[in-house]
């Protein structure tokens, strides 16, 4: 039987992007690959995974998608039930045909996929859309090998909030303060269901079980070495469209993953064309984070004080919080631009961009490294504090902003300090720019033919082919 891999991402932009790119690369290796999306996304968005194929299943919200759910918990519960049945039907419909599925690769947050695959007799391989470091923290925490230090005491002292304690001498993780750990290990926040999924996503995996990571060996060498003691962990990233990965621009000339759930603005790249090289601060906090009025004002004042042109992405749902009265002059004179969305890969690839003010979601972090853009890391929650720590301390590709403990926000002076640190041309800026450029070269080498991630993908292809032969 010929191998045929079914790729099942979580139906959100940040989770789909790397798995669409993975599906493309796997298919380019000569393995039949089908990417699964939802019926709502298939109808409302242009998903191009060529040379992989695309099939749609039900997530229980066929008419309105995630936005039609009463909340996150309701969506996930209904999705698990509907998608389990729909995915099983898709697999069963092909079971006796020449293009039957022989393996499933699924987003590690989609824990409902594993029992479906097992019931169908298919090997199931989790794909982590987060860093190896964050995944390792979740995994070791779930296994009782990592102890989280306590938070601040009631009297205001640190309450012993020192480094996270590892019960074994070498797990590949550096010592981290409580504030540098993924927040879900000590605070489930407003999404307890997602927090538990994060912590338990690899709990079932054993030493011989494949786990694929959207990272590359050179970036997270020690962490990967630690993970391979417990899992068959392989880095196959960065799953970012890059020239060395066979990337070709779309019909509109853009660098694209192939799945845009939000229509980007065109005007921002034309605005960037008018700016000198490395002169613009690009500011974006992803598709989920909501900064609030106070943080938006501090951010605006800090960016203005830094004196650099800036391109700021603010979701349409949060646009009413933008302090327009502060930005009126800057936007009128072309010193600033505020847009609801933009083609981020094109922006990061643009020579005018000198730094990326980012929440340090893993996709954004990996994209900045892949395009050699220094970062100002303003982590908010979940995996972001760990990524921000590594941007500054492990990779030297930017600086971390420190949140004011009393105000609970990043103050304007801290924003100004960080932007100037990576853009003013001093020693720190030169070092960050040099490191970012070196990581860009390593990232592209990793996915180029014969690179570390390319070799790991070839190893996975061999596993898939061997499994199909046995059927």
Curated annotation (Swiss-Prot):
It comes from the Eukaryota. InterPro entries: UDP_glucos_trans, UDP_glycos_trans_CS. Keywords: Glycosyltransferase, Transferase. It holds the Pfam family UDPGT. Pathway: Plant hormone metabolism; auxin conjugation. The keyword Glycosyltransferase applies. UDP-alpha-D-glucose binds at residues 129, 344, 359, 362-364, 367, 383-384. It catalyses: (indol-3-yl)acetate + UDP-alpha-D-glucose = 1-O-(indol-3-ylacetyl)-beta-D-glucose + UDP. One of its GO terms (molecular function) is quercetin 7-O-glucosyltransferase activity. The active site is at 15 (proton acceptor), 107 (charge relay). CDD domains: GT1_Gtf-like (cd03784). One of its GO terms (cellular component) is cytoplasm. This is Indole-3-acetate beta-glucosyltransferase. The gene is IAGLU. The lineage of its organism: Eukaryota, Viridiplantae, Streptophyta, Embryophyta, Tracheophyta. An anthocyanidin binds at residue 15. Belongs to the UDP-glycosyltransferase family. Its EC number is 2.4.1.121. It is an enzyme of class 2 (transferase).
